Amino acid sequence: MDKKLIIIDGNSIINRAFYALPDMNNKDGLKTNAIYGFTTMLFKIIDIYKPTHISVAFDRKAPTFRHLEFEEYKAGRKKMPDELRVQFEPLKNLLDKFNINRIEIDGYEADDIIGTVSRVAEEDGFKVFIVTGDKDAIQLASNNITTLITKKGVADVEEYNYDSVLEKYEMTPTQFIDLKGLMGDKSDNIPGVPGIGEKTGIKLIKEFSSVEGIIENIDSLKGSIKKKIEENKELALMSKKIATIIRNVPIEFNLKDLEYGNYDKNSVIEEFKKLGFTSLMSRLIDLDGDSNQNKIKLDFNISKLDNINEFIENVNKKKELILKIVKKEGNILEKNIMYVFLSLDGKNIYYIDESDVTNLKDVFSSNEIKKFGYNLKDDYIALRPYGIKLENLNFDISIAEYLIDSTSTTSYECSDIAMKYLALKIKSREELLGKGVKAKKYNELDFKELSEHISNTINLVKEVRPYMEESLNDMEMKSLFYDVEMPLVEVLGFMEFEGIKVDKYKLSELGIEFKEMIVKLEEDIFEMSGEKFNINSPKQLGNILFEKLKLPIIKKTKTGYSTNAEVLDKLREKHPIIDKISEYRQIVKLNSTYVEGLLNIINPISGRIHSSFNQTITTTGRISSTEPNLQNIPVKLEIGRNIRKVFIADNDCDLVDADYSQVELRVLAQMSQDKNMIDAFVHNEDIHTKTATQVFNVTSNEVTPELRSAAKAVNFGIVYGKSDFGLSEELHIPLKEAKAYIENYFNKYSKIKEFMEKTIEDACINGYVKTMFNRRRYIPELKSNNFMLRNAGKRAAMNAPIQGSAADIIKIAMVNVYKKLEEKNLKSKLILQVHDELIVETVKEELELVKSIVREEMENAVSIDVKLDVDLNVGKSWYETK
């Protein structure tokens, strides 16, 4: 095998990577963009050139002989940004994990180390590849040494060997030093000969071979060139000397020490995890191929479960079961199971088809047997049509990973988890099925391919669970995981399967009403504008508003004028057409999203909507929902509230709606321990009225609805980390006035200010914030050198503990209400959660008991100084409960 050496100019490449890539941080807030860029370049170079040996040369801070020769050498260079400086040691540490040789020496630059090592390697029969962003290294090119100059950041390189230098510059690589001597180098502050550029320099060197040759033949020169050389010949010689790379640096090294490939892959993986380089793990595997001795493989056997009784006996002994259900697409209420894959040890994996599902009913529904898996909510729902309730959902790796890192850019798929924990490449769902209209369904897959994919999942659960448990324990989130998040999986599965009834007739009526309103608004808008146009076209609307009606231009886009909601809000006072356009947009959205949208997803069997509840989407811990997104039904306008009329109770039932009152402010009072705010809640004062008296210096009798509304905006603005500018925009008041509001607020609620400041301070140190229940949210933006991102990070740091704690409380309440309804064997069902609100579809004869249970469990979900308060209402529709 040919001996190939890659030698990298460490300072040059990390510097280029830093400026080429956007700001990046790991979970601890360490800047990582330069390390990431360097590593991707390293992988690319290894992949293309297949080196047997690698070394990285770094500059040292100590002055070199060049500084002694010329004091102004590299003078005027910008100071290295701190954001780059802090990345050098972590990069060197990563190179050590790769067992990649590093060389640095006082008095010499990386260029000189590269020059020396490349010479020694060439003499030893190596093919050498120098990677740098500095064209000075072109002088080192030869038949066996190729200089790779990076371009476009670090993404691409340009190759220079002896022949290509000769072709491009019409000179030899060593003559490139003479060119530098003549034309200088601004980046290194090498003066050269003033007035001599690249074109003239090349011409002179072609004629006289070198700087010395030009000086010896100075009389042959003419005009201004002769004068320039004559006046600056010492400068030219000195510039050449400084530009010359030393090739005999006194360093002791053995080429054997530069061998690449003998490294502990697991150590590299751990370092990637610390740096947050999950995406590079798959490239690490591709880099090494199957030959890497450290490669981890999932190990399993797949077979059909023939002896069900023996399996039941074994699972009852072990009290643990890993499972994954594969189902075909179909109605949520119908039997759609194709296969159930089962394992006791993660290695021996069995499967049954639909015909045997009910034979394992006792295993599935046993509360004594812990169930482990991935996306267990889907498994719970799949079994419900068979009259089976999957009990004791103990460990779901997607939920665990979400708790460990709620800000992950991955979707918590098995493929992402396998890569992170095992550096193992398994197919993602998209890779297995494809995407878009050409995507396959599970029942269209070859059984071998399907079974291997599902078995990978089961084996993965077994392999990563211990690591995840250790992380949850270290992060003090075991209780949150086992007592809240895992019981919640069943609750959400239950709610999803049960759904909420929809009055289809009422919904159609609402659609007719909306369409009539849309037509009327169109007529009004056309009349006000004096012509018909496409209101939904930002371009046409912009032309009407800003060219025809001459309204002030607030913001421009690449294609014209911005007409977004923020712009329209600023134009409200300028023309009556603005309110009409805003109303038109609201009704069009309501009609398309909640009338046409809901009509399309009403289940034909149940007449209900079965929304999907998502547990691993938001960074704060809140539950979200899709198809439809019930969290986003507008409630501020009556027209939006009307949507709630279509959500109704089943026959002989009522909806019991229980909504936490100001839960986030109560959490804020608890976490800050602000006596003023705690007292207000303890004495059942209206907190917004209380805040109005504190902020506006008025008595409670003097608090008008407008002042209370402003105080409410201040209260929640503080919770969401709103700035004085944001508050001024919301309340349409001067910036100075908004600033005074916030200052008054913090003067009266001083402990809240202390709490906010301490939260940000701790977040900057730790890289994350925590809720009352130890849920973490990492905030790398706090370490950003971008002012806007940093401020956004501060707002997130202030808000996440409050909103996250409120989310934890509603989850605890959901679990407790669900359990209590089950314990009492009630027919009433918890069917919906929206923000701080729970809805129970209640059988009439159980109404009083359900009201009592819901209030009791919600108000006592957690024990805190500030009592939780619940607004509880009953109605036939969701609308009637408000």
For each predicted feature, which ranges?
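Noncatalytic, basic helical substrate-engagement surface that gates or grips nucleic-acid strands
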Residues: 2-131, 135-159, 235-238, 244-252, ...
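Active-site-proximal helix-loop-helix substrate-binding element of RNase H-like nuclease domains
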Residues: 155-156, 162-180, 297, 335-472, ...
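C-terminal polymerase-core module
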Residues: 519-523, 527-579, 747-795, 799, ...
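Function-dense linear segments that define catalytic or interfacial modules
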Residues: 341-346, 406-407, 412-435, 453-460, ...
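Non-catalytic nucleic-acid-binding/docking modules located in mid-to-C-terminal regions
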Residues: 2, 51-55, 89, 98-100, ...
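Conserved "right-hand" nucleotidyltransferase catalytic core of DNA-directed polymerases
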Residues: 232-355, 437-638, 654, 664, ...
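Conserved RNase H-like, two-metal-ion catalytic cores of nucleic-acid enzymes
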Residues: 5-6, 10, 16-55, 71-72, ...
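Conserved catalytic core of nucleic-acid polymerases
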Residues: 440-443, 497, 610, 616-618, ...
